[in-house]
A protein has these predicted regions:
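Aromatic/hydrophobic pocket-lining residues that form the small-molecule binding cavity
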Residues: 4, 35, 131, 135
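Conserved beta-strand hairpin/beta-sheet module of binuclear metal-dependent hydrolase folds
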Residues: 1-18, 100-110
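Active-site neighborhood of phospho(di)ester-bond hydrolases with catalytic His/Asp-centered motifs
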Residues: 2, 23-31, 50-53, 91-93, ...
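Active-site HxH/HxHxD metal-binding segment of metal-dependent hydrolases
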Residues: 6-84, 162-170
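Well-ordered beta-strand positions
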Residues: 3, 72, 80, 92, ...
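Short, flexible loop segments at the rims of nucleotide/cofactor-binding pockets, characterized by
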Residues: 1-4, 27-28, 67, 89-90, ...
């Protein structure tokens, strides 16, 4: 499960209704709207691991809502959950510990890349310069994975290369 948000009961009900099992919780960054339910979901799922990059461990409590993490991941790691493999790409900018996760043809971007936009950089740990570098890196990825952002509709990396003003600016340098 990627970025379960802060309503664990809703998430756990949806998992149960579909007959699924949570094997791990993968957090793209440490902000409360992505991590708030991680501890409860982990406990309800047999204490499955909760992954977060070290870069977000020092976030102010008003942003992190008491981060819960049992495992760390960083650039180049591959996390296997069942039959799925998630390749970790560090993409700082929205926060120092932001990561994107590539699983087959799916790219989970958290708050790094949205449909025709990108995440804010004005929170503690945010950096406009690092965000531009991360967007340029994503733009340079091969292929056209489906982008599943932390907020808003899904898109494709190809669509964002063509239409996202933040990404096109980052590509120009």
């Amino acid at each position: 499960m990627v970025d379960p948000g802060y309503e664990p009961n809703t998430v756990l009900s949806a998992v149960a209704e579909r007959g699924l099992k949570v094997g791990a919780v993968l957090l793209t960054h440490g902000h409360f709207d992505h991590v708030g339910g991680a501890k409860e979901i982990s406990k309800a799922s047999g204490s499955c691991p909760v992954y977060l990059n070290d870069g977000d461990l020092e976030l102010p409590s008003r942003l992190s809502c008491g981060i819960y993490r049992t495992a760390a991941y960083s650039e180049g790691d591959v996390i296997t959950v069942g039959e799925a493999e998630f390749a970790v790409m560090q993409t700082p900018g929205h926060s120092m510990g932001s990561v994107c996760l590539l699983c087959g043809g799916l790219l989970f971007t958290g708050d790094t890349l949205f449909y025709r936009s990108c995440g804010r950089t004005d929170f503690p740990g945010g950096s406009p310069k690092l965000m531009r570098q991360s967007l340029a890196r994503l733009a340079g990825m091969p292929g056209n994975p489906t982008v599943l952002p932390g907020h808003g509709p899904a898109t494709t990396l190809g669509h964002e290369r063509e239409t996202n003003p933040y990404m096109t600016k980052a590509m120009r340098g």
